[in-house]
Amino acid sequence: MDQEGGGDGQKAPSFQWRNYKLIVDPALDPALRRPSQKVYRYDGVHFSVNDSKYIPVEDLQDPRCHVRSKNRDFSLPVPKFKLDEFYIGQIPLKEVTFARLNDNVRETFLKDMCRKYGEVEEVEILLHPRTRKHLGLARVLFTSTRGAKETVKNLHLTSVMGNIIHAQLDIKGQQRMKYYELIVNGSYTPQTVPTGGKALSEKFQGSGAATETAESRRRSSSDTAAYPAGTTAVGTPGNGTPCSQDTSFSSSRQDTPSSFGQFTPQSSQGTPYTSRGSTPYSQDSAYSSSTTSTSFKPRRSENSYQDAFSRRHFSASSASTTASTAIAATTAATASSSASSSSLSSSSSSSSSSSSSQFRSSDANYPAYYESWNRYQRHTSYPPRRATREEPPGAPFAENTAERFPPSYTSYLPPEPSRPTDQDYRPPASEAPPPEPPEPGGGGGGGGPSPEREEVRTSPRPASPARSGSPAPETTNESVPFAQHSSLDSRIEMLLKEQRSKFSFLASDTEEEEENSSMVLGARDTGSEVPSGSGHGPCTPPPAPANFEDVAPTGSGEPGATRESPKANGQNQASPCSSGDDMEISDDDRGGSPPPAPTPPQQPPPPPPPPPPPPPYLASLPLGYPPHQPAYLLPPRPDGPPPPEYPPPPPPPPHIYDFVNSLELMDRLGAQWGGMPMSFQMQTQMLTRLHQLRQGKGLIAASAGPPGGAFGEAFLPFPPPQEAAYGLPYALYAQGQEGRGAYSREAYHLPMPMAAEPLPSSSVSGEEARLPPREEAELAEGKTLPTAGTVGRVLAMLVQEMKSIMQRDLNRKMVENVAFGAFDQWWESKEEKAKPFQNAAKQQAKEEDKEKTKLKEPGLLSLVDWAKSGGTTGIEAFAFGSGLRGALRLPSFKVKRKEPSEISEASEEKRPRPSTPAEEDEDDPEQEKEAGEPGRPGTKPPKRDEERGKTQGKHRKSFALDSEGEEASQESSSEKDEEDDEEDEEDEDREEAVDTTKKETEVSDGEDEESDSSSKCSLYADSDGENDSTSDSESSSSSSSSSSSSSSSSSSSSSSSSESSSEDEEEEERPAALPSASPPPREVPVPTPAPVEVPVPERVAGSPVTPLPEQEASPARPAGPTEESPPSAPLRPPEPPAGPPAPAPRPDERPSSPIPLLPPPKKRRKTVSFSAIEVVPAPEPPPATPPQAKFPGPASRKAPRGVERTIRNLPLDHASLVKSWPEEVSRGGRSRAGGRGRLTEEEEAEPGTEVDLAVLADLALTPARRGLPALPAVEDSEATETSDEAERPRPLLSHILLEHNYALAVKPTPPAPALRPPEPVPAPAALFSSPADEVLEAPEVVVAEAEEPKPQQLQQQREEGEEEGEEEGEEEEEESSDSSSSSDGEGALRRRSLRSHARRRRPPPPPPPPPPRAYEPRSEFEQMTILYDIWNSGLDSEDMSYLRLTYERLLQQTSGADWLNDTHWVHHTITNLTTPKRKRRPQDGPREHQTGSARSEGYYPISKKEKDKYLDVCPVSARQLEGVDTQGTNRVLSERRSEQRRLLSAIGTSAIMDSDLLKLNQLKFRKKKLRFGRSRIHEWGLFAMEPIAADEMVIEYVGQNIRQMVADMREKRYVQEGIGSSYLFRVDHDTIIDATKCGNLARFINHCCTPNCYAKVITIESQKKIVIYSKQPIGVDEEITYDYKFPLEDNKIPCLCGTESCRGSLN
């Protein structure tokens, strides 16, 4: 180590010492003169100085190893400055003075009371110097200002020990000393001492107070330490004269509930203004010292601020007439005073008075008459503010304003802590508005008195002038707490709560408050606008004084600030809307107001301080005021030069106002537009636009005002055109109330940015301001018109931009979030495969879509269309309650369960992801509009959207419902319930479910029409899974749903064509089949391919069935087919709505590549035939023809109507998820059993019904084989995906499905005779040249019986392993015939497994009708639902086996994707362990009533054995207490006993021991926790729930005190009534306590011959009471007993206590 001054010898070594120690330091040890340098010791041996006197350490040890050393904690407190007379700087508000305390309050109690609010440093109770009597005064010093403020806020005017205490921040205890003097002098008692207002100030004012000169005032201010001496110099006689101050201030303040009420500290800063003799008065009476006008120091802030303000205002507004000047001055003074007095929310009156006083003080020449005029103004709450606003501020005023404004802005920034605090504490009671932020020039309202403030007034003062004032000003405020009860945070919080757009935080500073007060200058009692704006530029206008409050809030010139002013700190503000409502200026008020003094103009009216007004223009309007109302239009200001009264407000700091205005605008917009929340992005955009507009135009144009252009310029944050600059903003709102151009004056009060310069034309002359309301209105109308157009255009532009932005964002959002990119890719791949069919289907679907414009994507369409259409058009749209948010609803990703019918619908709509349900609901109409625009930008693929839109459009109604989840939820809930029932009683439930399903399907059909649209809107519509799910029934109809067709591209194409046709049919059917809730509208389920479709060409051609109306198709098909028919309809190319496609076409239309969904092995036949016909390149059969051809028989059965039913074979919940076209009951087995829609065993057995595992597998593989017409794997994945899946990205699902493809696992069983006559599927056969193709061909949802698939097709399907049999719909039939060949083995196996599964799951369905009809193939939706069940219930062994089989089959297929070769089978844990619902056993609880009704059941005895099951002798509560440690309780009890003993010993005599006092003491705290329960002794007993020590009071025996005679009578009556127990307890010879019918738990105490308690009679307040005391320690759960001590009688009452010493009887 480098030695600083080491000796040469020691420094010589080149190596560095490891350790060193400073041995000698001459600087620290002056005694050692000899060493002139420091001496170091290195490594304990070597020294830096060669001196033998230093002895090295002998044993070198690591100094750190102090094994025995002890660590001691050093307290190193941070030194704090002592706040004595030498302290320089602002004294922190850490001292709280309490007054009117109960004389029992001592230091400890007070400290504990205050400690919760902050760390207490010192507590002192003031005692009388001679008598040492409690004076009710206390001083508490906190370590932080926060604690002090919180204490005042929470304890002021609260009851403590019966006294309403007074708490206030008190710098240096100035107020406390005043109270002390008043009490010690005998003037007041501790409980009557005035804690604020005039009384207190007068007490300390000298007799000469009235004549107090400016000098004396200066002295006062200096005493206050806040009042600048210079300020008083200007003090006018008015200031000096108490009468002038009192009059002006008191009048206004008195009129307004003390603006400076005890809650509002006089100093705006909120520091108690100690200097003012009037402090108490100002605080309590809401009078400032100046208000007091006693010679005693006027409010320092008022005086100095007023003086400065007056001077400035005077000079500025000198141009205006004297009267107007005086008025303006008064107004300004008032504003300033109010600002100072009431921090943020200044009372107009107070502000006016303060301004007047300032004016007077500032101008020594200020005539007394001015003062009187000011008073008059205050009393009248004269409108001069408006006038002032209208008048162009004089140049001087502008200068003054500029000077002031800088501080004002500063003050605008963070409110001074003290002030806010005071405001917070200011109770609402003080009606006077809290002082507005002091004008910048004026200095902090609180600091107004400070010379700095005065100087600032004269010259621009530094930010937070209030602060600039010496701490004294704060001290000056008597009730600092009241001066600013609201801290900035609290005010902001308050504003937020009020949802105001005003910027209270801006005006938070004292200056701001003063400025606000100035702005309030013109405030009139009548509610005329107080020209707060005059005093304040950017500052938010102080709330109008209470007097103004009474008047129409608009009256106040400040944008609500004045109106708010009535409430100090904004706490008292009458209405949260004060910014808006209060801001409305009543024309009458304006008219009545005297000409505003020029001074007020100095400061542009600040927006209402507490709530930052949105652009002041808006602020003037009541929040609730409809933005679109004409009231906004304000008459243009007179062209003449604006009255000098309004000097152009100095431009507020751009950052402040831009920011503020933007915020205001946003807030206002939010408030105006039905409170619809705006997204952060929207807000940001809006603000950006506003800012740009402001920069570019500097006009109102920038405002993204309320949607309605009605706001006009006023709405805009930017200053309106000069005319409107002042008036417009507020005028708009003001007019809202008065319908007149109140704005002119109000505008001046707007923040500076808003009222840039008073434009001569814009400013209204004072006379104008005074015009009667009509005249003003006329003026306003005339004046507003010019700007109205600009405003409207700007707003329109903004709205349009917002719409476009929102549309773009929404589209992007919808595209990204709703239609996932992966899903799109997957979809596209499918589309490519299905293109041949898609094209035809899409064309038809498009036609249908055009005819039936439906929302393509509920959320997206509605949003986009709404935006494009202009929403509600105009800002008004936003103004509507739903608001922007309502209009723009983002898609909900919430998984909604749809009933089968809904699902089918959803599948049709599947592609479009419905936006949030709520959105969908709201958007439905718009969505319908949008439906017409399927290809909307932002929707995923326009094609899909179109298709989807078409289907959705058709189903929009239901979709809307579904979007809400109402339909789906209802159906699904019912289905779920049924499903649960099924779980309990699967077989029974299944049977019931079939009926239920039929009913549900019918109901859902009806609902489906509604829910169709809803389902479309539902997420399922968007999700492919949904498409798949819906594709079954919907894909048939889904073909109609182009979206679905797009979802499974092949499917979608066919489904599109079939969609359109099916849609048409569905539409037609819907009316007819509404009961069935013809799901056809659900076009989304493209996935539902009809196996026929692949063969479509042949089938279509071959099938004689021409496209029948959907109804016809439905009839053609059995009811069940009807459900499916819609899906098949989608399959057939959508025909123009004109002709409903034949059912056959639907199957064809089903997505050519409809994904046959494998039913999850559980609960449903594992083999679910998916009528998913992969769109094979083969041309689709003619849309109409294929369905009929496909289902000649089925069609004949009944063209599937749009009736939505729960998909059979699907659990209700799945059915709800996948609404398939309700199959008509005729469908027979097809109907879902138990609402689950499972196929009957026979159905399952049938090849057609077999799940198209191969198809599923093929679907899964489809992505790989896009080129292949059939996508078994893809279809599988589609099939697998249910509506829930639909929400998930399909690509992922497909991949997962491929890995876990159980569909392919089971080869199609040999086709059993097709349930429906297998429709010839030549095209499908061709299409499904590969097994996968075949599989895809057979859509599960075959509405009509599909012609048996051509053998080759079936063979192909079988080969692919997709087994059309899975497609229980058409494919089932087809497979039943065709798959019987090769698929017979697999099909049979699968069917058997499914059948067995179905048997397990539900009772065997009735013998299936002929295979074709008896067992209609499940709709693709059913298949998907069944397949998707794996996601809900988990993977069971059957699912696993099918997955394995599918995987193996896929590997064996040559057509399989190559990627399969890279995969290997991995066993997956079985997650669906069937745990049948545990049926409640009768013995689990009380027996069930045999009759089912407790009332009709009558009474039946319950044996004790039964009761014991649910009655525990030892209640849980008691058992819980067993583990409780009784030691603590015993300790407490012992302490209490010892305390009693001490008390007794202190009292002494035994006589006293029996005194009531002692007994009462014994009773008061001794309630024990007891409970009653079954007793081993007799019936009920009383048990202890806590340990009870000996000689403790246990309980009082409570009852009715009756005489002996009454007791005898009652006893006889009780016996007659059968009341065997006696609850009569004798107190003495005359009194008996009867607890029989009225008492407490004590009556349950049983008798015991060896009791643990005894009864004692004590007298309390001349009443005898029976108290049970413990005789010995009693444990928890021990029964309380005592000896009844019945008199001996011959008739013995047996004793049941059973103790060893039992006497055997009670008497």
From Swiss-Prot:
Residue spans of biased composition, Pro residues class: 430-440, 593-617, 624-655, 1077-1094, 1127-1145, 1308-1323, 1404-1414
Boundaries of every SET domain copy: 1568-1685
Chain intervals with Acidic residues compositional bias: 918-927, 976-992, 1003-1012, 1275-1284, 1360-1377
Residue ranges of the region described as Interaction with ASH2L, RBBP5 and WDR5: 1450-1537
Compartment annotation: Nucleus speckle; Chromosome; Cytoplasm
This enzyme's EC code(s): 2.1.1.364
Record-linked SUPFAM superfamilies: RNA-binding domain, RBD (SSF54928), SET domain (SSF82199)
Effect on the protein of changing residue 913 to C: In EPEO2; affects the development of synapses in a mouse model overexpressing the human protein harboring this variant
UniProt keyword Phosphoprotein, yes or no: yes
Region (Interaction with WDR82) location: 60-89
Every RRM domain range: 84-172
Motif range (RxxxRR motif): 1537-1542
Any GO CC annotation of this UniProt entry: nuclear speck
Disease annotated for this entry: Epilepsy, early-onset, 2, with or without developmental delay: An autosomal dominant neurologic disorder characterized by early onset of generalized tonic-clonic seizures associated with sharp wave and sharp slow wave discharges on EEG. Some EPEO2 patients have normal psychomotor development and normal brain imaging, whereas others may show developmental delay associated with abnormalities on brain imaging. Neurodevelopmental disorder with speech impairment and dysmorphic facies: An autosomal dominant disorder characterized by global developmental delay, intellectual disability, speech delay, subtle facial dysmorphism, and behavioral and psychiatric problems.
Protein name according to UniProt: Histone-lysine N-methyltransferase SETD1A
